[in-house]
A protein has these predicted regions:
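Domain-level signal for soluble alpha/beta catalytic cores
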Residues: 1-392
Length: 392
């Protein structure tokens, strides 16, 4: 017996997407959630993405809805854990995402929607691929667990710091939980974010019933819960797993009676690691300065001998002493500072979750360190003379 799942036809996909436009959706995502270079060769990927965008565009054309309609390129996780949690390289992930982005842009999408990301580093790779290949708007949505954190530990505040630092146009949460379970996550986004906050919850929690997956929240309750979060300040709302067009229709109707809350500039100074954010301005912040060769002969020796273990040991000592940030300076005239700072950033974030302060006057080294950093780093020693910050 052939148990291979039947692939949907273009007509079936168009019908489904049209039903969401008919329900009042402004944005419908292309059928490309799992489309990436790890699963398809370049020719297959281009054909798949091009067809998916064409189908969504046709669904918008056929829809009876009179609202503005947009097609978003849907990008989901690669399905690989990046180092240090897994064995996949960060730059390889950027390259894989870039392929999908390029094909989607060429096919004529209106925006890019990165969603259901459960790892901050994977999220950064996807957003970097978008930013390096298009000027289209990009929305970024992460999948949080019941503990209010991503699978690899990031808090909403940490994601706000990093994603705003990379100029995402809207940020928020989707999948994994229903709207009531995501209230705490959404409130943290609203506390820190200066860009629109988005929300696409599941239709509650799934369970198996007669061999099928069903959900425990129905359209009236769903729209009521989402409506309360719209009143708190969420500006973009939709649905994820289990949300049929009836759910979207209910949310659209509910939103008509709600006055949108203005998006406000929070004027916060945040830095972050892959787990948490640190806010400046309320109380003194303790920054460890031991990872610095100035006046430290033993540290200088470690740099010359490529002794990364000594540097990691200094980081852990300072963490145990209670510092909140780690300054990282590996500048010596005789070493390759860009290469060593890149290595130091990678190795440090594998052993500590303290945010890093990258300390260098070399713009090439700074760029390498910031690119590899899993969070939003603090920048030190860059001055305003000439073009010292031209690459930052």
């Amino acid at each position: 017996m052939n148990l291979q799942k039947k692939k949907p036809t273009p007509e079936e996909i168009i019908r489904i997407q049209k039903s969401y436009y008919d329900a009042g959706s402004n944005v419908v995502l292309s059928n490309t959630f799992g489309a990436n270079g790890l699963k398809f060769d370049d020719e297959e990927l281009e054909q798949l993405v091009t067809a998916a965008v064409k189908n969504a565009r046709e669904a918008a054309r056929q829809s009876s809805g009179t609202q503005e309609k947009f097609v978003a390129l849907d990008i989901g996780p690669l399905g690989k854990l990046l180092k240090p949690y897994g064995d996949y390289e960060f730059e390889d992930a950027v390259a894989m995402y870039a392929k999908t982005v390029k094909f989607g842009v060429a096919a004529g999408v209106d925006l890019v929607f990165i969603e259901t990301m459960n790892d901050s580093y994977d999220t950064k790779a996807a957003l970097l691929a978008v930013k390096e290949n298009t000027d289209l708007p990009v929305f970024v949505s992460n999948a949080y667990g019941a503990d209010g954190k991503l699978m690899t530990g990031a808090s909403p505040a940490a994601m706000v710091a990093m994603l705003e630092g990379m100029h995402a146009d809207a940020i928020g949460a989707n999948c994994s939980l229903g709207p009531d379970q995501l209230v705490g996550v959404v409130e943290e986004y609203l506390e820190y974010a200066s860009v629109p906050v988005l929300l696409k919850p599941n239709a509650g929690l799934p369970r198996a019933e007669n061999g099928k997956t069903v959900y425990d929240v129905f359209p009236p309750e769903f729209s009521e819960s989402v409506g309360k979060l719209l009143e708190k300040g969420v500006r973009i709302a939709g649905g994820c797993c289990g949300t049929t067009p009836d759910y979207i229709r209910a949310v659209v109707e509910k939103s008509k009676s709600i006055t949108p809350v203005p998006v406000t500039e929070k004027n916060l100074s945040l830095v972050s690691s892959y787990t948490h954010a640190v806010k400046f301005g309320e109380s003194p912040i303790l920054i460890g300065e031991r990872i610095n060769p100035t006046g430290k002969k033993r540290f200088q020796q470690a740099l010359r001998e490529n002794d990364i273990d000594y540097i990691l040991g200094e980081a852990l000592k300072q963490q145990d002493a209670g510092v909140q940030l780690l300054d990282v300076n590996v500048g010596l005239p005789e070493i390759d500072e860009p290469a060593f700072l890149l290595r130091a950033v990678r190795e440090l974030q594998a052993v500590t979750d303290l945010p890093l302060q990258l300390d260098t006057t070399d713009p090439v080294a700074m760029e390498a360190g910031l690119r590899a950093y899993n969070g939003k780093a603090m920048v030190n020693s860059v001055n305003g003379k000439g073009l010292s910050h031209h690459r930052q």
